[in-house]
Amino acid sequence: MLELHRNTIQQIAAILLTAIFLTGCKEKPLDEGVPEPDGADTLIVCPADSSTIYGTVTNLGKPLKGVVVSDGTMCVQTDTNGIYQLNSTKKHGLVYISIPSGYTVRPAGTVPQFFKQTAKPAGEAERIDFELFKDVDQTNHTMIVLGDIHLFNESSVKAFGTFRQEINSLSGSGIWPCPYVMTMGDMSWDYYWYATPFGLEDYLGQMNGLQGLHVFSTVGNHDHDMMIDSKTEYETTGEDFTCQNSYRELLGPTCWSVNIGGIHYMSIDDVITTDDGTGKDGRGCRRGLTENDREWIRQDLSYVSKDMPVVVAMHIPLFNHNGNDYDKKLGEYTSITSLFKDHDVTFMSAHTHSLYNTVKEDEGQRVEEWVTGALCGDFWSSANKHGVNLCTNGAPGGYRVITATGSHISSVYKATGTDGNFFFRSYDRNTMDFSASLMCPKAPSGSKQQKFWNDKAKVYTGSSSENIVYIHVWDMKEGWTLTVTEDGNALDPVKVSLHDPLFLAANIAGQCNSTREEWSIGTNSTICGQMYRVTASSAGSTLVISVTDSEGNNHTETMKRPKEFSIKKYIN
């Protein structure tokens, strides 16, 4: 069934396509030193009796062995001739590869084309080939992780433009070795697909302004079509599949993997959509995996060495800020983490528009999760109104930068518009008074909005002479240190769980400052679990606050007190 033959013309065409590729995408040398065409072997391939999708994976016409290929349900490997065979129902309408380490693919804009659409009916065999290109040395590489982008209108696009300019400048400067980008879901906002309209196509138009970067995507709850009755579909089939059709067409599979350097990156769809198809008020979701996706994870991991670190991207977190199960079902998160029990795994998520990190031990399995703050912060609201982009727990809007050195990874959260060593903000309680009469004076006495404000801001309400200082270290995790000294004497930071005062002032106060009788909160404040409290000896002493991350990077503030509290004071 297999015949080898020589084809010089096809080899020349491959090299010409590579040249075009090199001038139009990643600013990296790919397939350097390609020899003159000499008629490299190409393959005529016939489908196996049971195959409905088959083909080859090659590099400049030469077969690549051991590349994992999937249809979204099952995974197989190419043989010594670079051939794969899939007995697929073509349910996903896709076939895709797990890009092997050391290789890359052509992009369409910023979207790496590791996937292709099927074209023939389910029972009809079709050939789909993949061409890979050698990448630069990926041993040391950078993954830029973007949580909750939410592009949906003109103001969000304008704010996003500032970030895009920053990324283009930094990635072009060479300070990030071999950079890639991965989103963590909610790139768009399903309601505005119809209201603006602004959909995934428009989002891609903005992302394509990133220069020379490949952007891998994770699906979020707001990247589903809300006008599809996913609730009924899930109840009857165990799948929320149809609402993802637009996503798959534009961004590819919802569960996929790629090998970069010594790291196996995997993105999984942990969103169970329960939209009823009626629009905005009928939306809903929860965390979970379908049985199809569980099986895909098992099969993908079966081809991954136990010695290779795995980084898993998903939208909805495993844990909330205090380490409890985010889904509020005790231990339910283990239905996800147990799939990875034989691997050295780090989980990344988003969804909450807040930033925190968790490490747990469960029956001998170490589970670490980085919940990445939202690039859009509070849906770009505080950025547009006050010039300070804030997540709902007060962390700055920004993105995570993963640095991989061989099989070692580290990460730091970078606030947009700042340098990489911006780890905390400090607040002097003596200069704060969040009384409702000052912060939301329009709210009628005893109104719902005034009560709401009083509950959120009670720790900061009224004058204070207790010399308390609060320090929000948003990305605090294992291996980080916080030290505070007052006139050379060490103070003992105490961890507390509070609402961040800057977010209350920049977002919640404005919402509560309303005379409306029928009032409800829009974007809400969430608890900051990485807040620390120290008590100084006087109102005018100077504190030296120092935070050092696990890689030795340091942010130190000499806090001269009294320190003014105002939104303007904290603009990055």
Question: Which role fits each region the language model picked out?
Answer:
Residues 65, 73-88:
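Short, acidic Ser/Thr/Gly-rich low-complexity loop/linker segments typical of extracellular
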Residues 59, 128-136, 149-151, 246-325, ...:
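Conserved catalytic scaffold of divalent metal-dependent phosphoesterases
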Residues 26-28:
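Bacterial signal peptide processing site
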Residues 21-24:
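C-terminal motif of bacterial Sec signal peptides marking the signal peptidase cleavage site
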Residues 43-52, 60, 102-195, 572:
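N-terminal active-site segment of His-dependent metallophosphoesterases
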Residues 33-53, 109-124, 147-150, 167-168, ...:
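Metal-dependent phosphoesterase/phosphodiesterase active-site architecture
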Residues 50-54, 59-73:
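Short, ordered, surface-exposed loop/turn motifs in non-cytosolic proteins
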Residues 102-120, 192-304, 330-346, 357-405, ...:
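Extended active-site neighborhood of metal-dependent phosphoesterases/phosphodiesterases
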